[in-house]
């Protein structure tokens, strides 16, 4: 697959995405149906008859599962099981082992009842009292597989998620609680799944061309994982870099060339030591968390703040992982891959790796 991308003429990148990266529509239809069945099953069965008041309020897909940017082939995603009658992020952390065990028990029952159209396999926890649980939905005939990490979560947005129109001030109280608990518990960035709805909204109303560009970057990232065999920065960091490049390009270059976008993302990867990117969308410097946010953007780089969780630096702290990916990005930049049919070179846009003022576009 790496050769297929590398050998693709740069002016045919859009065609490559369409032919090689877009998922099979039949698989997507069956996947949505199975996810609905699993979600309904968990909402109906989990914690029924339990002495405590915790119940499943809803189930939301997150992580790399996104109907706008999901890839053909093998992918990973999150299934977030939101719980009501928790009162804090700390409640989520303290009860996670119990919640995981309950959900695992019912997923095994669902597997036995064979209600899914796709092949459904629950993975056994790797150790007793595990905080991790996963299952797979696959279609071997179409060579599609999606592995889900199941994560129970405090439904922090339960009371505000339906407010229309979108107004970031609705989240002031939630973010004040989040930053206080995260700093007290020393768990910054560990509750980002509670904001899965906002992660989805961040991409939902974007242009389809951006979704396809994210698919291309995700595909390149997977090729790097296969080749380099070492730890790499989180994939979501690359997705956010892609959004950042897009937001710049939509102003400067209304025509938006896929190859230029892609090259610019790779150029930013090579400048990882200077990255400081954040969005003032769900939170900003007018909120109660202004002082906290000021401290966040002064921290060591690379810094890519989660647009829905100001406590989470999506870039992580592994500089060796970034260095490994940056070297691979430079190999692609220096290669003939970005050569046009007239032998000219596709140039990157001059996008600053540090953003002075960020807004949601």
Curated annotation (Swiss-Prot):
Keywords: Cytoplasm, RNA-binding. GO terms for molecular function: double-stranded RNA binding; enzyme inhibitor activity. Disulfide bonds: none annotated. Expressed specifically in oocytes (at protein level). Expressed at highest level in ovary with lesser amounts in intestine, brain, thymus lung, kidney, liver and uterus. It is found in: Cytoplasm. One of its GO terms (cellular component) is cytoplasm. Disruption phenotype: Newborn mice are viable. Female mice display reduced fertility due to deficiencies in ovarian follicle development, reduced efficiency of ovulation, and the arrest of fertilized eggs at one-cell stage. Induction: Unlike other OAS1 proteins, not induced by polyinosinic:polycytidylic acid (poly I:C). It comes from the Eukaryota. Coiled coil: none annotated. InterPro entries: 2-5-oligoAdlate_synth_1_dom2/C, NT_sf. One of its GO terms (biological process) is ovulation from ovarian follicle. Does not have 2'-5'-oligoadenylate synthetase activity, but can bind double-stranded RNA. May play a role in the control of female fertility, possibly by binding to and inhibiting OAS1A. Belongs to the 2-5A synthase family. Interacts with OAS1A, the interaction inhibits OAS1A catalytic activity. This is Inactive 2'-5'-oligoadenylate synthase 1D.
């Amino acid at each position: 697959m790496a050769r297929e991308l590398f050998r693709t003429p740069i002016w045919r990148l859009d065609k490559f995405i369409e032919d090689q990266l877009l998922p099979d529509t039949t698989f997507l239809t069956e996947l949505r149906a199975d996810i609905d069945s699993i979600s309904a099953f968990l909402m109906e069965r989990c914690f029924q008859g339990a002495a405590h008041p915790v119940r499943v309020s809803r189930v939301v897909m997150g992580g790399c599962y996104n109907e706008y940017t999901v890839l053909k082939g093998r992918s990973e995603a999150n299934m977030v099981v939101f719980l009501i009658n928790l009162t804090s992020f700390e409640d989520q952390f303290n009860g996670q082992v119990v919640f995981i065990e309950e959900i695992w028990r019912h997923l095994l029952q669902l597997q036995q009842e064979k209600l899914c159209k796709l092949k459904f396999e629950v993975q056994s926890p790797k150790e007793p009292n595990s905080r991790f649980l996963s299952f797979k939905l696959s279609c071997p005939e179409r060579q599609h597989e999606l592995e889900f990490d199941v994560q129970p979560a405090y439904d922090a947005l339960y009371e505000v998620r339906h407010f229309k129109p979108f107004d970031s001030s609705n989240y002031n109280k939630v973010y004040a609680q989040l930053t206080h608990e995260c700093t007290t518990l020393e768990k910054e960035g560990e509750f980002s799944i509670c904001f899965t709805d906002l992660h989805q909204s961040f991409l939902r109303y974007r242009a389809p061309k951006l979704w396809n560009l994210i698919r291309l970057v995700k595909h390149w990232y997977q090729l790097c994982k296969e080749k380099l065999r070492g730890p790499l920065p989180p994939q979501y960091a690359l997705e956010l870099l892609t959004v950042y490049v897009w937001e710049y390009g939509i102003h400067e270059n209304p025509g938006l060339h896929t190859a230029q976008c892609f090259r610019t993302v790779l150029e930013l990867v090579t400048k990882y030591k200077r990255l400081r990117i954040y969005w003032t969308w769900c939170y900003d410097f007018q909120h109660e968390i202004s002082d906290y946010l000021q401290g966040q953007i002064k921290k060591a780089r690379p810094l890519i703040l989660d647009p829905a969780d100001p406590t989470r630096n999506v870039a992580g702290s592994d500089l060796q992982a970034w260095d490994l990916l940056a070297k691979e990005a430079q190999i692609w930049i220096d290669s003939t891959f970005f050569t046009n049919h007239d032998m000219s070179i596709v140039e990157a846009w001059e996008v600053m790796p540090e953003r002075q003022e960020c807004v949601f576009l």
